[in-house]
Protein backbone atom coordinates (compact mmCIF):
# COMPACT_ATOMS: atom_id res chain seq x y z
CA UNK A 1 0.00 0.00 0.00
CA UNK A 2 1.35 3.40 -1.04
CA UNK A 3 1.80 5.66 1.96
CA UNK A 4 1.23 9.39 1.74
CA UNK A 5 3.54 11.91 3.29
CA UNK A 6 2.49 13.51 6.55
CA UNK A 7 3.10 17.00 5.16
CA UNK A 8 0.84 16.41 2.16
CA UNK A 9 -1.88 14.98 4.37
CA UNK A 10 -1.61 17.99 6.66
CA UNK A 11 -1.88 20.43 3.75
CA UNK A 12 -4.84 18.62 2.18
CA UNK A 13 -6.77 18.25 5.42
CA UNK A 14 -6.24 21.82 6.67
CA UNK A 15 -6.97 23.29 3.25
CA UNK A 16 -10.17 21.28 2.81
CA UNK A 17 -11.35 22.09 6.32
CA UNK A 18 -10.68 25.79 5.77
CA UNK A 19 -12.37 25.85 2.36
CA UNK A 20 -15.46 23.97 3.53
CA UNK A 21 -15.73 26.08 6.68
CA UNK A 22 -15.43 29.38 4.83
CA UNK A 23 -17.74 28.24 2.04
CA UNK A 24 -20.43 27.08 4.47
CA UNK A 25 -20.08 30.32 6.42
CA UNK A 26 -20.48 32.32 3.22
CA UNK A 27 -23.53 30.28 2.22
CA UNK A 28 -25.14 30.99 5.58
CA UNK A 29 -24.41 34.71 5.22
CA UNK A 30 -25.75 34.70 1.65
CA UNK A 31 -28.89 32.87 2.77
CA UNK A 32 -29.69 35.56 5.33
CA UNK A 33 -28.73 38.35 2.92
CA UNK A 34 -30.95 36.86 0.21
CA UNK A 35 -33.85 36.71 2.60
CA UNK A 36 -33.25 40.28 3.75
CA UNK A 37 -32.88 41.61 0.21
CA UNK A 38 -35.94 39.70 -1.00
CA UNK A 39 -38.03 41.12 1.82
CA UNK A 40 -36.73 44.58 0.95
CA UNK A 41 -37.78 44.12 -2.69
CA UNK A 42 -41.19 42.88 -1.58
CA UNK A 43 -41.60 45.87 0.74
CA UNK A 44 -40.80 48.24 -2.12
CA UNK A 45 -43.37 46.54 -4.31
CA UNK A 46 -45.97 46.57 -1.54
CA UNK A 47 -45.32 50.25 -0.88
CA UNK A 48 -45.76 51.16 -4.54
CA UNK A 49 -48.94 49.08 -4.81
CA UNK A 50 -50.33 50.77 -1.71
CA UNK A 51 -49.45 54.21 -3.11
CA UNK A 52 -51.34 53.40 -6.31
CA UNK A 53 -54.37 52.33 -4.30
CA UNK A 54 -54.24 55.54 -2.26
CA UNK A 55 -53.99 57.53 -5.48
CA UNK A 56 -57.30 56.12 -6.71
CA UNK A 57 -58.89 57.01 -3.37
CA UNK A 58 -57.53 60.54 -3.47
CA UNK A 59 -58.96 61.71 -6.80
CA UNK A 60 -61.47 60.62 -9.44
CA UNK A 61 -60.34 58.15 -12.05
CA UNK A 62 -60.83 60.64 -14.87
CA UNK A 63 -58.29 62.96 -13.26
CA UNK A 64 -55.58 60.31 -12.89
CA UNK A 65 -52.89 60.45 -15.55
CA UNK A 66 -49.93 58.24 -16.42
CA UNK A 67 -47.71 60.86 -14.82
CA UNK A 68 -49.56 60.41 -11.52
CA UNK A 69 -49.11 56.68 -11.72
CA UNK A 70 -45.41 57.01 -12.52
CA UNK A 71 -44.92 59.22 -9.50
CA UNK A 72 -46.04 56.35 -7.27
CA UNK A 73 -43.73 53.81 -8.93
CA UNK A 74 -40.17 52.97 -8.03
CA UNK A 75 -37.36 51.90 -10.31
CA UNK A 76 -37.90 48.78 -12.39
CA UNK A 77 -41.64 48.74 -11.71
CA UNK A 78 -44.69 48.65 -14.02
CA UNK A 79 -48.37 49.22 -13.15
CA UNK A 80 -51.41 47.89 -15.04
CA UNK A 81 -54.94 48.96 -14.08
CA UNK A 82 -57.94 46.75 -14.89
CA UNK A 83 -61.60 47.42 -14.38
CA UNK A 84 -63.94 44.93 -12.84
CA UNK A 85 -64.48 43.35 -16.26
CA UNK A 86 -60.74 42.72 -16.69
CA UNK A 87 -60.38 45.45 -19.27
CA UNK A 88 -56.98 47.13 -19.25
CA UNK A 89 -57.28 50.84 -18.52
CA UNK A 90 -53.71 51.94 -17.77
CA UNK A 91 -50.23 50.46 -18.35
CA UNK A 92 -47.16 52.47 -17.55
CA UNK A 93 -43.69 52.35 -15.96
CA UNK A 94 -40.86 54.71 -15.03
CA UNK A 95 -38.65 53.16 -17.71
CA UNK A 96 -39.01 50.95 -20.73
CA UNK A 97 -37.11 48.01 -19.29
CA UNK A 98 -40.10 46.39 -17.62
CA UNK A 99 -42.51 44.96 -20.11
CA UNK A 100 -44.16 41.83 -18.81
CA UNK A 101 -47.41 40.34 -20.04
CA UNK A 102 -48.96 38.77 -16.93
CA UNK A 103 -51.37 36.70 -18.98
CA UNK A 104 -54.92 35.71 -18.23
CA UNK A 105 -53.94 33.77 -15.16
CA UNK A 106 -53.67 37.04 -13.28
CA UNK A 107 -57.41 36.88 -12.81
CA UNK A 108 -57.07 33.86 -10.61
CA UNK A 109 -53.77 34.07 -8.72
CA UNK A 110 -53.37 35.12 -5.14
CA UNK A 111 -52.29 38.57 -4.13
CA UNK A 112 -48.52 38.04 -4.66
CA UNK A 113 -46.82 35.72 -7.13
CA UNK A 114 -43.35 35.34 -8.59
CA UNK A 115 -43.05 34.91 -12.35
CA UNK A 116 -40.07 34.37 -14.63
CA UNK A 117 -40.13 36.06 -18.01
CA UNK A 118 -37.28 36.00 -20.54
CA UNK A 119 -34.78 34.87 -17.90
CA UNK A 120 -35.75 37.55 -15.37
CA UNK A 121 -37.76 37.06 -12.19
CA UNK A 122 -40.64 39.42 -11.35
CA UNK A 123 -42.88 40.00 -8.36
CA UNK A 124 -46.53 40.62 -9.33
CA UNK A 125 -48.85 42.10 -6.71
CA UNK A 126 -52.59 42.14 -7.31
CA UNK A 127 -54.34 44.90 -5.36
CA UNK A 128 -58.17 45.42 -5.50
CA UNK A 129 -59.33 49.04 -5.97
CA UNK A 130 -62.82 50.06 -4.90
CA UNK A 131 -63.84 53.72 -4.83
CA UNK A 132 -67.04 55.69 -5.38
CA UNK A 133 -66.42 56.02 -9.09
CA UNK A 134 -64.20 53.01 -9.84
CA UNK A 135 -64.10 49.31 -9.16
CA UNK A 136 -61.26 47.16 -10.41
CA UNK A 137 -57.76 46.12 -9.50
CA UNK A 138 -54.12 46.90 -10.12
CA UNK A 139 -51.19 44.68 -11.07
CA UNK A 140 -47.84 45.99 -9.89
CA UNK A 141 -44.94 44.27 -11.66
CA UNK A 142 -41.63 44.60 -9.81
CA UNK A 143 -38.44 43.44 -11.53
CA UNK A 144 -36.02 41.29 -9.48
CA UNK A 145 -33.21 41.62 -12.00
CA UNK A 146 -31.18 43.86 -9.71
CA UNK A 147 -31.81 41.52 -6.79
CA UNK A 148 -30.71 38.50 -8.85
CA UNK A 149 -27.56 40.31 -9.94
CA UNK A 150 -26.70 41.13 -6.34
CA UNK A 151 -27.23 37.50 -5.28
CA UNK A 152 -25.07 36.27 -8.16
CA UNK A 153 -22.38 38.74 -7.16
CA UNK A 154 -22.55 37.47 -3.59
CA UNK A 155 -22.02 33.90 -4.78
CA UNK A 156 -19.08 34.96 -6.93
CA UNK A 157 -17.58 36.93 -4.04
CA UNK A 158 -18.06 33.97 -1.70
CA UNK A 159 -16.42 31.62 -4.18
CA UNK A 160 -13.55 34.02 -4.80
CA UNK A 161 -13.11 34.58 -1.08
CA UNK A 162 -13.13 30.82 -0.51
CA UNK A 163 -10.54 30.25 -3.25
CA UNK A 164 -8.29 33.05 -1.96
CA UNK A 165 -8.62 31.83 1.62
CA UNK A 166 -7.89 28.29 0.44
CA UNK A 167 -4.74 29.41 -1.38
CA UNK A 168 -3.59 31.39 1.66
CA UNK A 169 -4.36 28.45 3.95
CA UNK A 170 -2.56 26.02 1.67
CA UNK A 171 0.49 28.30 1.60
CA UNK A 172 0.52 28.72 5.37
CA UNK A 173 -0.05 24.99 5.84
CA UNK A 174 2.82 24.21 3.49
CA UNK A 175 5.21 26.49 5.39
CA UNK A 176 3.99 25.36 8.80
CA UNK A 177 3.94 21.65 7.91
CA UNK A 178 7.44 21.98 6.48
CA UNK A 179 8.61 23.39 9.80
CA UNK A 180 6.76 20.66 11.67
CA UNK A 181 7.97 17.76 9.55
CA UNK A 182 11.53 19.02 9.14
CA UNK A 183 12.58 17.70 12.58
CA UNK A 184 10.79 14.43 11.82
CA UNK A 185 12.71 14.11 8.55
CA UNK A 186 15.94 14.88 10.44
CA UNK A 187 14.96 12.27 13.00
CA UNK A 188 14.37 9.70 10.28
CA UNK A 189 17.66 10.53 8.56
CA UNK A 190 19.48 10.32 11.89
CA UNK A 191 18.00 6.87 12.48
CA UNK A 192 19.29 5.81 9.08
CA UNK A 193 22.75 7.18 9.95
CA UNK A 194 22.73 5.39 13.29
CA UNK A 195 21.73 2.17 11.59
CA UNK A 196 24.61 2.64 9.18
CA UNK A 197 27.32 4.19 11.36
CA UNK A 198 26.40 3.34 14.94
CA UNK A 199 25.69 5.57 17.94
CA UNK A 200 28.39 8.19 17.45
CA UNK A 201 26.06 10.99 16.35
CA UNK A 202 23.24 12.61 18.27
CA UNK A 203 20.23 14.51 16.98
CA UNK A 204 20.89 18.25 17.17
CA UNK A 205 17.60 20.14 16.90
CA UNK A 206 16.53 23.50 18.25
CA UNK A 207 13.02 24.46 17.20
CA UNK A 208 10.35 26.78 18.55
CA UNK A 209 8.06 23.86 19.30
CA UNK A 210 8.22 22.31 22.75
CA UNK A 211 6.80 18.97 21.58
CA UNK A 212 9.40 18.60 18.82
CA UNK A 213 12.24 19.52 21.16
CA UNK A 214 10.93 17.02 23.70
CA UNK A 215 10.78 14.40 20.97
CA UNK A 216 14.38 15.11 19.98
CA UNK A 217 15.54 15.00 23.60
CA UNK A 218 13.66 11.76 24.19
CA UNK A 219 15.20 10.30 21.05
CA UNK A 220 18.71 11.28 22.18
CA UNK A 221 18.07 9.83 25.63
CA UNK A 222 16.75 6.65 24.07
CA UNK A 223 19.81 6.44 21.81
CA UNK A 224 22.07 6.95 24.82
CA UNK A 225 20.29 4.17 26.68
CA UNK A 226 20.48 1.88 23.67
CA UNK A 227 24.16 2.72 23.21
CA UNK A 228 24.79 2.04 26.89
CA UNK A 229 22.86 -1.21 26.68
CA UNK A 230 24.74 -2.17 23.53
CA UNK A 231 28.08 -1.39 25.16
CA UNK A 232 27.08 -3.33 28.26
CA UNK A 233 26.03 -6.26 26.13
CA UNK A 234 29.29 -6.13 24.18
CA UNK A 235 31.27 -5.83 27.41
CA UNK A 236 29.25 -8.67 28.89
CA UNK A 237 30.03 -10.92 25.93
CA UNK A 238 33.70 -9.98 26.06
CA UNK A 239 33.90 -10.58 29.80
CA UNK A 240 31.98 -13.84 29.57
CA UNK A 241 34.23 -14.99 26.74
CA UNK A 242 37.29 -14.08 28.78
CA UNK A 243 36.00 -15.89 31.87
CA UNK A 244 35.20 -18.99 29.83
CA UNK A 245 38.46 -18.89 27.87
CA UNK A 246 40.72 -19.19 30.92
CA UNK A 247 39.29 -22.44 32.38
CA UNK A 248 38.93 -23.90 28.89
CA UNK A 249 42.60 -23.17 28.17
CA UNK A 250 43.54 -24.78 31.48
CA UNK A 251 41.48 -27.87 30.65
CA UNK A 252 42.98 -28.01 27.16
CA UNK A 253 46.49 -27.75 28.56
CA UNK A 254 45.96 -30.58 31.05
CA UNK A 255 44.29 -32.77 28.42
CA UNK A 256 47.37 -32.30 26.26
CA UNK A 257 49.49 -33.13 29.30
CA UNK A 258 47.49 -36.31 29.86
CA UNK A 259 47.83 -37.22 26.21
CA UNK A 260 51.58 -36.77 26.36
CA UNK A 261 52.51 -38.02 29.85
CA UNK A 262 49.43 -39.14 31.68
CA UNK A 263 49.23 -42.56 30.07
CA UNK A 264 52.48 -43.58 31.72
CA UNK A 265 52.47 -41.42 34.85
CA UNK A 266 49.47 -41.97 37.17
CA UNK A 267 50.44 -38.95 39.29
CA UNK A 268 50.29 -36.61 36.28
CA UNK A 269 46.99 -38.20 35.21
CA UNK A 270 45.45 -37.75 38.67
CA UNK A 271 46.61 -34.16 39.03
CA UNK A 272 45.45 -33.15 35.53
CA UNK A 273 42.07 -34.80 35.97
CA UNK A 274 41.49 -33.07 39.32
CA UNK A 275 42.42 -29.69 37.89
CA UNK A 276 40.26 -30.28 34.81
CA UNK A 277 37.29 -31.25 36.99
CA UNK A 278 37.83 -28.16 39.15
CA UNK A 279 37.89 -25.90 36.10
CA UNK A 280 34.84 -27.65 34.65
CA UNK A 281 32.95 -27.00 37.89
CA UNK A 282 34.03 -23.37 37.61
CA UNK A 283 32.56 -23.22 34.09
CA UNK A 284 29.31 -24.82 35.28
CA UNK A 285 29.01 -22.31 38.10
CA UNK A 286 29.73 -19.42 35.73
CA UNK A 287 27.08 -20.62 33.27
CA UNK A 288 24.53 -21.01 36.06
CA UNK A 289 25.20 -17.47 37.25
CA UNK A 290 24.92 -16.13 33.72
CA UNK A 291 21.58 -17.90 33.31
CA UNK A 292 20.43 -16.44 36.61
CA UNK A 293 21.14 -12.96 35.27
CA UNK A 294 19.48 -13.49 31.90
CA UNK A 295 16.65 -16.00 32.39
CA UNK A 296 13.28 -14.72 31.28
CA UNK A 297 11.23 -15.39 34.41
CA UNK A 298 13.42 -13.45 36.80
CA UNK A 299 11.24 -10.37 36.42
CA UNK A 300 8.05 -12.24 37.31
CA UNK A 301 8.13 -12.02 41.07
CA UNK A 302 4.40 -11.82 41.76
CA UNK A 303 3.38 -15.32 40.67
CA UNK A 304 5.65 -17.14 43.16
CA UNK A 305 6.01 -14.46 45.84
CA UNK A 306 5.47 -15.66 49.39
CA UNK A 307 5.76 -14.16 52.83
CA UNK A 308 9.36 -14.54 53.94
CA UNK A 309 10.10 -14.24 57.66
CA UNK A 310 13.49 -12.58 57.51
CA UNK A 311 14.75 -13.46 61.00
CA UNK A 312 13.69 -17.12 60.70
CA UNK A 313 15.38 -17.47 57.31
CA UNK A 314 18.59 -15.90 58.62
CA UNK A 315 18.67 -18.19 61.68
CA UNK A 316 18.18 -21.23 59.44
CA UNK A 317 20.95 -20.20 57.05
CA UNK A 318 23.37 -19.30 59.88
CA UNK A 319 22.81 -22.70 61.46
CA UNK A 320 23.78 -24.41 58.20
CA UNK A 321 26.76 -22.11 57.69
CA UNK A 322 28.14 -22.90 61.13
CA UNK A 323 28.16 -26.56 60.19
CA UNK A 324 29.76 -25.84 56.82
CA UNK A 325 32.36 -23.37 58.12
CA UNK A 326 33.17 -24.34 61.72
CA UNK A 327 36.28 -22.15 61.71
CA UNK A 328 34.19 -18.98 61.23
CA UNK A 329 32.35 -17.08 63.95
CA UNK A 330 28.83 -16.03 62.97
CA UNK A 331 27.26 -13.45 65.29
CA UNK A 332 23.63 -12.34 64.97
CA UNK A 333 21.79 -9.33 66.34
CA UNK A 334 18.22 -9.86 65.17
CA UNK A 335 15.42 -7.51 66.12
CA UNK A 336 12.59 -8.86 68.21
CA UNK A 337 10.10 -7.28 65.83
CA UNK A 338 8.56 -9.43 63.16
CA UNK A 339 10.18 -8.66 59.80
CA UNK A 340 8.31 -9.94 56.75
CA UNK A 341 8.66 -9.37 53.04
CA UNK A 342 6.87 -10.66 49.94
CA UNK A 343 9.30 -12.35 47.57
CA UNK A 344 10.39 -15.74 46.28
CA UNK A 345 11.93 -17.67 49.19
CA UNK A 346 14.80 -19.03 47.10
CA UNK A 347 15.67 -15.49 46.01
CA UNK A 348 16.06 -14.32 49.60
CA UNK A 349 18.19 -17.36 50.38
CA UNK A 350 20.27 -16.74 47.27
CA UNK A 351 20.99 -13.06 47.93
CA UNK A 352 21.76 -13.72 51.62
CA UNK A 353 24.21 -16.49 50.79
CA UNK A 354 25.87 -14.30 48.14
CA UNK A 355 26.75 -11.67 50.75
CA UNK A 356 27.81 -14.32 53.31
CA UNK A 357 29.93 -16.08 50.69
CA UNK A 358 31.49 -12.74 49.75
CA UNK A 359 32.27 -12.03 53.41
CA UNK A 360 33.85 -15.47 53.87
CA UNK A 361 36.07 -15.03 50.79
CA UNK A 362 37.45 -11.67 51.89
CA UNK A 363 37.76 -12.32 55.63
CA UNK A 364 40.23 -15.19 55.80
CA UNK A 365 42.14 -13.74 58.75
CA UNK A 366 39.67 -12.67 61.44
CA UNK A 367 36.94 -15.06 60.28
CA UNK A 368 34.25 -13.12 62.09
CA UNK A 369 30.95 -12.24 60.40
CA UNK A 370 28.01 -10.40 61.95
CA UNK A 371 24.39 -10.29 60.74
CA UNK A 372 22.07 -7.62 62.12
CA UNK A 373 18.40 -6.85 61.43
CA UNK A 374 16.28 -3.92 62.50
CA UNK A 375 13.09 -2.04 61.67
CA UNK A 376 13.36 1.71 61.10
CA UNK A 377 10.61 3.93 59.71
CA UNK A 378 8.79 0.85 58.37
CA UNK A 379 11.96 -0.18 56.51
CA UNK A 380 13.36 -3.68 57.01
CA UNK A 381 17.14 -3.42 57.25
CA UNK A 382 19.64 -6.28 57.04
CA UNK A 383 23.32 -5.59 57.71
CA UNK A 384 26.08 -8.10 56.94
CA UNK A 385 29.51 -7.14 58.28
CA UNK A 386 32.88 -8.79 57.83
CA UNK A 387 36.30 -7.82 59.19
CA UNK A 388 38.24 -8.56 56.05
CA UNK A 389 40.43 -6.63 53.66
CA UNK A 390 37.80 -4.02 52.78
CA UNK A 391 37.01 -2.41 49.44
CA UNK A 392 38.87 0.68 48.16
CA UNK A 393 36.64 3.74 47.83
CA UNK A 394 37.37 4.09 44.12
CA UNK A 395 36.07 0.54 43.53
CA UNK A 396 32.86 0.80 45.56
CA UNK A 397 30.83 2.27 42.70
CA UNK A 398 31.69 -0.66 40.43
CA UNK A 399 31.47 -3.77 42.62
CA UNK A 400 27.92 -4.51 41.40
CA UNK A 401 28.97 -4.48 37.75
CA UNK A 402 29.12 -7.85 36.07
CA UNK A 403 32.53 -9.55 36.22
CA UNK A 404 33.99 -6.70 38.25
CA UNK A 405 36.51 -7.85 40.84
CA UNK A 406 38.57 -5.65 43.12
CA UNK A 407 41.44 -8.16 43.29
CA UNK A 408 41.22 -10.36 40.20
CA UNK A 409 43.98 -12.75 41.20
CA UNK A 410 42.55 -13.25 44.69
CA UNK A 411 39.00 -13.66 43.36
CA UNK A 412 40.04 -16.25 40.85
CA UNK A 413 42.01 -18.23 43.39
CA UNK A 414 38.91 -18.23 45.58
CA UNK A 415 36.58 -19.28 42.77
CA UNK A 416 34.83 -15.96 42.17
CA UNK A 417 33.42 -14.95 38.80
CA UNK A 418 32.43 -11.38 39.66
CA UNK A 419 28.73 -12.11 39.15
CA UNK A 420 27.46 -12.73 42.68
CA UNK A 421 26.92 -9.12 43.73
CA UNK A 422 25.32 -8.33 40.34
CA UNK A 423 22.80 -11.12 40.92
CA UNK A 424 22.14 -9.97 44.49
CA UNK A 425 21.60 -6.38 43.42
CA UNK A 426 19.19 -7.45 40.70
CA UNK A 427 17.15 -9.55 43.14
CA UNK A 428 16.99 -6.66 45.62
CA UNK A 429 15.90 -4.16 42.99
CA UNK A 430 13.26 -6.51 41.56
CA UNK A 431 11.73 -6.74 45.02
CA UNK A 432 11.66 -2.99 45.55
CA UNK A 433 14.72 -2.79 47.77
CA UNK A 434 18.02 -0.96 47.77
CA UNK A 435 21.56 -1.63 48.92
CA UNK A 436 24.28 0.49 50.50
CA UNK A 437 27.92 -0.24 51.22
CA UNK A 438 30.33 1.02 53.86
CA UNK A 439 33.91 -0.21 53.78
CA UNK A 440 37.37 0.65 55.07
CA UNK A 441 40.64 -0.89 53.93
CA UNK A 442 41.86 -3.64 56.31
CA UNK A 443 38.93 -3.00 58.66
CA UNK A 444 36.02 -4.65 56.92
CA UNK A 445 32.88 -4.11 54.90
CA UNK A 446 29.20 -3.70 55.76
CA UNK A 447 26.47 -4.31 53.22
CA UNK A 448 23.12 -2.74 54.19
CA UNK A 449 20.06 -4.23 52.48
CA UNK A 450 16.87 -2.16 52.78
CA UNK A 451 13.33 -3.32 51.91
Curated annotation (Swiss-Prot):
Its main subcellular localisation, reduced to a broad class, is membrane
Name all Histidine kinase domain ranges.
Answer: 239-451
InterPro entries per the record?
A: ArlS_N, Bact_Sensor_His_Kinase, HAMP_dom, HATPase_C_sf, His_kinase_dom, HisK_dim/P_dom, HisK_dim/P_sf, Sig_transdc_His_kin-like_C
Is the keyword Cell cycle assigned to this protein?
A: no
The EC number of this protein is 2.7.13.3
Q: Does the keyword Nucleotide-binding apply?
A: yes
Q: What is this protein called?
A: Signal transduction histidine-protein kinase ArlS
**Which chain regions cross the lipid bilayer?**
11-31, 156-176
Q: What lineage does UniProt assign to this protein's organism?
A: Bacteria, Bacillati, Bacillota, Bacilli, Bacillales
Arranged from A to Z, the UniProt key words for this protein are: ATP-binding, Cell membrane, Kinase, Membrane, Nucleotide-binding, Phosphoprotein, Transferase, Transmembrane, Transmembrane helix, Two-component regulatory system, Virulence
Q: Which reaction does it catalyse?
A: ATP + protein L-histidine = ADP + protein N-phospho-L-histidine
Question: PROSITE patterns attached here?
Answer: HAMP, HIS_KIN
Q: Name one GO molecular function term.
A: phosphorelay sensor kinase activity
Q: How does it sit in the membrane?
A: Multi-pass membrane protein
Which modifications occur after translation, per UniProt? Autophosphorylated.
**Main function:** Member of the two-component regulatory system ArlS/ArlR involved in the regulation of adhesion, autolysis, multidrug resistance and virulence. ArlS probably functions as a sensor protein kinase which is autophosphorylated at a histidine residue and transfers its phosphate group to ArlR.
* Domain HAMP: start-end pairs: 178-231
Record-linked CDD domains? HATPase, HisKA
SUPFAM superfamilies with a match to the protein in the record: ATPase domain of HSP90 chaperone/DNA topoisomerase II/histidine kinase (SSF55874), HAMP domain-like (SSF158472), Homodimeric domain of signal transducing histidine kinase (SSF47384)
Amino acid sequence: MTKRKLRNNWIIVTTMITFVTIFLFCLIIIFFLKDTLHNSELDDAERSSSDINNLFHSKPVKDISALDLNASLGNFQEIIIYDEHNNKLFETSNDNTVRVEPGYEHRYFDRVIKKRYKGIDYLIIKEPITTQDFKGYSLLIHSLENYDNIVKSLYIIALAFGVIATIITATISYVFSTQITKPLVSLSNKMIEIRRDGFQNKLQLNTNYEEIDNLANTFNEMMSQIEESFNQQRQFVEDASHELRTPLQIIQGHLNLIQRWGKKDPAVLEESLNISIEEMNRIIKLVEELLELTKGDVNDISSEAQTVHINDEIRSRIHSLKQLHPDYQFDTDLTSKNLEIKMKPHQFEQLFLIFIDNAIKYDVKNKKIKVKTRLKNKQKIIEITDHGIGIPEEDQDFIFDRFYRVDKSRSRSQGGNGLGLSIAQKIIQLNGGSIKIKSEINKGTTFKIIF
